[in-house]
Amino acid sequence: MRLYELITFTLRVRTPAEALKHLRETLAEARDGCVLMGCWLSEIGLLNQIAVLRGFRDETARQAERERFLQAPDAFGIEAFMLDMKVENYTLFPFLEPLAPGHHGPFYELREYNLIPSGLAPTMAGWEKAVGPRTGAGYSAVYAAFFATDGRTPRYLHIWPYASQEQRLDVRTRAVADGVWPPENSGPQLREMHSTLYLPAAFSPLQ
């Protein structure tokens, strides 16, 4: 599965818990060819956000599901709580396979980087070389990395699970000190960097 969609819901204060109850049911109504990968609630960063990551069999399935929920009345059952909904299309980096569903967190860091116009190819080349050592013994796994195919481009998203915030700090510090991360030539490609830490919903396949 190479095609993905990230939906970010921004909700009214003190409504996310109730919204998740509705999403547990409405996300199951997706069309065939759409698979829920993860559903998370923001913990550090911009609060009151729910991120939903879904994978698709092909572009036809992704477009069919997009049209379904855009045309349905209150498709996700949370319109009363919603301040904003952002939908983004992503394609998996060709040399990566996402982690299988299961317990990898509970902290999931979603990092989004905006790149210079010609920055995607050298970014992926650097990742292909460096991601093996960075995710090897003594460091930590990456869920996956994706490049955007709509909106403000080029940009990419990478998702990192951690058992604790202490583990995150330890691994990131050692990876830099050991010279295994960040990827070679990645800095000159960057324009902006954004990061949010999330915790999984009870029904999220990624915990």
Residue ranges, per PLM feature:
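Short amphipathic alpha-helical segments
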Residues: 15-36, 67-78, 119-144, 175-185
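Glycine-rich beta-strand-turn "strand-cap" elements at beta-sheet edges
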Residues: 1-2, 10, 35-51, 71-107, ...
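Short cationic/low-complexity microdomains
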Residues: 165-179
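Helix N-cap motif at beta-to-alpha junctions
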Residues: 15, 55-61, 116-120, 161-167
